[in-house]
Amino acid sequence: MAQSLSRLWTHLIFSTKNRFPFLSDKTIRMDMHRYLATILREQDCETLIVNGVEDHVHALFALSRTNAIASVVKEIKRTSSSWVKERSPKLAKFYWQGGYGAFSVSHSNLEDVIRYIENHEEHHKRMTFQDEYRAFLKAMVLPMMSVTFGIRWNADSLKA
Protein backbone atom coordinates (compact mmCIF):
# COMPACT_ATOMS: atom_id res chain seq x y z
CA MET A 1 0.00 0.00 0.00
CA ALA A 2 1.54 3.29 -1.09
CA GLN A 3 -0.36 5.48 1.36
CA SER A 4 -0.90 5.53 5.11
CA LEU A 5 -4.47 5.51 6.39
CA SER A 6 -5.59 5.97 9.97
CA ARG A 7 -8.84 6.76 11.77
CA LEU A 8 -8.33 6.52 15.54
CA TRP A 9 -11.21 8.14 17.41
CA THR A 10 -10.00 9.35 20.79
CA HIS A 11 -11.91 10.45 23.89
CA LEU A 12 -9.52 12.72 25.78
CA ILE A 13 -10.12 13.77 29.39
CA PHE A 14 -7.94 16.08 31.46
CA SER A 15 -8.44 18.40 34.39
CA THR A 16 -7.20 21.64 35.80
CA LYS A 17 -4.37 21.42 38.31
CA ASN A 18 -5.67 19.94 41.56
CA ARG A 19 -9.12 20.05 39.95
CA PHE A 20 -9.38 23.74 40.88
CA PRO A 21 -12.53 25.23 39.26
CA PHE A 22 -10.63 27.72 37.08
CA LEU A 23 -13.29 27.43 34.38
CA SER A 24 -16.27 28.40 36.54
CA ASP A 25 -17.04 31.44 34.35
CA LYS A 26 -19.27 29.92 31.67
CA THR A 27 -18.18 32.40 28.97
CA ILE A 28 -14.49 31.64 29.51
CA ARG A 29 -15.25 27.91 29.67
CA MET A 30 -17.13 27.96 26.35
CA ASP A 31 -14.38 30.07 24.76
CA MET A 32 -11.82 27.56 26.09
CA HIS A 33 -13.72 24.68 24.50
CA ARG A 34 -13.78 26.47 21.14
CA TYR A 35 -10.08 27.29 21.46
CA LEU A 36 -9.20 23.67 22.30
CA ALA A 37 -11.14 22.53 19.21
CA THR A 38 -9.16 25.02 17.11
CA ILE A 39 -5.84 23.75 18.47
CA LEU A 40 -6.87 20.15 17.76
CA ARG A 41 -7.77 21.06 14.17
CA GLU A 42 -4.39 22.80 13.81
CA GLN A 43 -2.84 19.47 14.87
CA ASP A 44 -4.73 17.82 11.97
CA CYS A 45 -7.16 16.16 14.38
CA GLU A 46 -10.74 16.08 13.09
CA THR A 47 -12.68 17.30 16.13
CA LEU A 48 -16.27 16.27 16.78
CA ILE A 49 -16.87 17.89 20.19
CA VAL A 50 -15.14 19.58 23.13
CA ASN A 51 -17.03 20.21 26.35
CA GLY A 52 -16.57 20.07 30.09
CA VAL A 53 -17.21 21.67 33.43
CA GLU A 54 -15.36 23.96 35.85
CA ASP A 55 -12.45 21.62 36.50
CA HIS A 56 -12.03 19.32 33.50
CA VAL A 57 -12.52 18.90 29.78
CA HIS A 58 -13.60 16.13 27.42
CA ALA A 59 -12.74 16.09 23.71
CA LEU A 60 -13.64 13.59 20.99
CA PHE A 61 -11.44 13.69 17.91
CA ALA A 62 -9.69 11.58 15.30
CA LEU A 63 -6.01 11.46 16.15
CA SER A 64 -3.84 12.66 13.28
CA ARG A 65 -1.86 9.85 11.66
CA THR A 66 1.31 11.95 11.97
CA ASN A 67 1.05 12.96 15.65
CA ALA A 68 1.33 10.95 18.84
CA ILE A 69 -1.36 11.51 21.47
CA ALA A 70 1.24 12.76 23.97
CA SER A 71 2.40 15.45 21.52
CA VAL A 72 -1.16 16.56 20.77
CA VAL A 73 -2.06 16.80 24.47
CA LYS A 74 1.14 18.66 25.30
CA GLU A 75 0.43 21.22 22.58
CA ILE A 76 -3.21 21.83 23.47
CA LYS A 77 -2.38 22.20 27.17
CA ARG A 78 0.59 24.49 26.55
CA THR A 79 -1.18 26.72 24.04
CA SER A 80 -4.52 26.94 25.86
CA SER A 81 -2.86 27.64 29.20
CA SER A 82 -1.02 30.64 27.74
CA TRP A 83 -4.16 31.81 25.94
CA VAL A 84 -6.40 31.76 29.04
CA LYS A 85 -3.80 33.54 31.20
CA GLU A 86 -3.66 36.37 28.65
CA ARG A 87 -7.47 36.62 28.62
CA SER A 88 -7.97 37.35 32.29
CA PRO A 89 -5.73 38.50 35.15
CA LYS A 90 -7.96 36.36 37.44
CA LEU A 91 -6.59 33.30 35.63
CA ALA A 92 -2.90 34.15 35.98
CA LYS A 93 -2.38 30.99 38.07
CA PHE A 94 -4.23 28.69 35.65
CA TYR A 95 -2.62 25.32 34.95
CA TRP A 96 -3.73 21.99 33.58
CA GLN A 97 -2.90 18.80 35.48
CA GLY A 98 0.14 16.86 34.33
CA GLY A 99 -1.72 13.71 33.28
CA TYR A 100 -4.65 12.83 31.05
CA GLY A 101 -6.84 9.94 30.00
CA ALA A 102 -7.11 9.03 26.32
CA PHE A 103 -9.47 6.23 25.33
CA SER A 104 -10.11 4.75 21.89
CA VAL A 105 -13.70 4.92 20.67
CA SER A 106 -15.25 2.56 18.15
CA HIS A 107 -16.91 4.25 15.18
CA SER A 108 -20.15 2.52 16.18
CA ASN A 109 -20.03 4.26 19.59
CA LEU A 110 -19.33 7.81 18.38
CA GLU A 111 -22.92 9.04 18.76
CA ASP A 112 -23.12 7.75 22.35
CA VAL A 113 -19.86 9.45 23.30
CA ILE A 114 -20.93 12.69 21.60
CA ARG A 115 -24.20 12.66 23.60
CA TYR A 116 -22.27 11.92 26.80
CA ILE A 117 -19.93 14.87 26.22
CA GLU A 118 -22.76 17.18 25.11
CA ASN A 119 -24.69 16.48 28.32
CA HIS A 120 -21.64 16.61 30.52
CA GLU A 121 -22.75 19.42 32.79
CA GLU A 122 -26.00 17.58 33.57
CA HIS A 123 -24.05 14.35 34.10
CA HIS A 124 -21.92 15.99 36.79
CA LYS A 125 -24.94 16.91 38.84
CA ARG A 126 -25.09 13.16 39.60
CA MET A 127 -21.42 12.10 39.57
CA THR A 128 -18.13 13.70 40.64
CA PHE A 129 -15.10 13.87 38.36
CA GLN A 130 -13.32 11.33 40.57
CA ASP A 131 -16.22 8.87 40.33
CA GLU A 132 -16.46 9.44 36.60
CA TYR A 133 -12.76 8.76 36.11
CA ARG A 134 -12.92 5.63 38.29
CA ALA A 135 -15.77 4.37 36.11
CA PHE A 136 -13.66 4.96 32.98
CA LEU A 137 -10.75 3.07 34.50
CA LYS A 138 -12.94 0.21 35.57
CA ALA A 139 -14.68 0.01 32.19
CA MET A 140 -11.45 0.20 30.23
CA VAL A 141 -9.57 -2.20 32.53
CA LEU A 142 -6.38 -0.19 32.51
CA PRO A 143 -3.89 -1.69 34.95
CA MET A 144 -1.12 0.31 33.27
CA MET A 145 -2.59 3.42 34.92
CA SER A 146 -0.37 2.58 37.88
CA VAL A 147 2.62 3.41 35.69
CA THR A 148 1.13 6.72 34.50
CA PHE A 149 -0.26 7.99 37.81
CA GLY A 150 1.85 6.07 40.33
CA ILE A 151 -1.22 4.49 41.91
CA ARG A 152 -1.59 0.77 42.61
CA TRP A 153 -5.00 -0.18 41.21
CA ASN A 154 -7.02 -3.08 42.49
CA ALA A 155 -10.74 -3.80 42.71
CA ASP A 156 -11.06 -1.98 46.06
CA SER A 157 -9.36 1.20 44.84
CA LEU A 158 -11.83 1.46 41.95
CA LYS A 159 -14.89 1.44 44.19
CA ALA A 160 -16.75 4.73 44.44
Q: Predicted regions span which residues?
A:
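Basic nucleic-acid-binding interfaces
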Residues: 1-159
